[in-house]
Amino acid sequence: MNTFGRKLRLTTFGESHGNAIGGVIDGFPSGVKIDEKFIQAELDKRKPGGKFATARKENDKVQIFSGIFEGVSIGTPIGFIIFNENQKSKDYENIKNLFRPGHADFGYFKKFVIRDYRGGGRSSARETAVRVAAGAFAQILLNEFDICVQSGIFSIGSINKGGEISNAKNLKMDFDYAQTSEIFSLFKEFENEMKNEILNAKNAHDSVGGNVVTRVKNVPAGLGEVLYDKIDAKIAYALMGINGVKAVEIGAGVKASEMIGSENNDEILPFGKFKTNHSGGILGGITNGDEIIVKSHFKPTPSIFLAQNTIDESGAVKTLSLKGRHDPCIAVRGSVVATAMMRLIVADMMLLNLGSTLTSLKKFYL
């Protein structure tokens, strides 16, 4: 499906080399002052260009055409569009019948038979620009509650020097610095090594993967459901839906399976504070008021410029040599997308939580 969320719903449309991509946000509350400059600034973070991203030059100017009146949300669907301006479909003519290793081509062909081969069509990460715009709307709503969502690069390829994330309180991740870093690095001291890792892969006509950490500050306790809408399950669902994400860890993640209970448990201090944060701010599918900490693992960009073996639509063995413009490391711009998806999840869960108690219902209706 092309719709995400329960109370706050985002529906996206468009393909990589089509005329435009866009989205409709439904369920956004009325009365929220919309800062369009902030939305554009978030899109600019994800915008292609530069030596650490694809050379495809897109302005990514968002045009909002509904749901906003005199700069304020009016409670109706918010529609917006981003026109594609720099497609080079001819780069894909020679491979239109071939399946690119590491891409969704083969699966799309088996499912739909007809597919848009230009830049991957609907499966392209180009669509994530829409998610970033929608996530910016969600952050504007979250700002009303002083909730801050940020992401940054924790590691690139073999450059993984940030330490164990099992207890994020002990790590010196600088999320504010990451917003100014060319590659969104959480560690200023390791940034050049990470950059070199990307450039070395790029110069070898190859690519490299990376890890992104997302943090939510000032999130209230009590968000999430006890069974099938656990907020950690929703977060994993949202982040695994980003192109190239192969694994998601919350808090200590897989490291928790190596601990003993007395080590993994976060002792509770006065005023509802926690000594450690192995849980990543979530217990029993519900937030506990500590920071939400999540790590997303991105695979290397599948589009590389080395010859690869594959087959065509008839099953004949072929050799694939790609052209075009591709990110040497999708984790870099993926960090912006991870932020957007987390914003949408938290905002959705806050809206869902409104009817969880009789007290909250009475406050609204009486």
Curated annotation (Swiss-Prot):
Q: Which Pfam families match?
A: Chorismate_synt
Alphabetic keyword roster: Amino-acid biosynthesis, Aromatic amino acid biosynthesis, FAD, Flavoprotein, FMN, Lyase, NADP
Q: In which pathway does it act?
A: Metabolic intermediate biosynthesis; chorismate biosynthesis; chorismate from D-erythrose 4-phosphate and phosphoenolpyruvate: step 7/7
Q: Say yes or no: keyword Magnesium present.
A: no
Origin: domain of life: Bacteria
Q: Which InterPro entries match?
A: Chorismate_synth, Chorismate_synth_AroC_sf, Chorismate_synthase_CS
Q: How is the cofactor bound here?
A: Reduced FMN (FMNH(2)).
Supply one GO BP term: aromatic amino acid family biosynthetic process
The protein's job, in short, is: This reaction introduces a second double bond into the aromatic ring system.
Similarity field: Belongs to the chorismate synthase family.
Relate the assembly described in the record.
Homotetramer.
The protein depicted here goes by the name Chorismate synthase
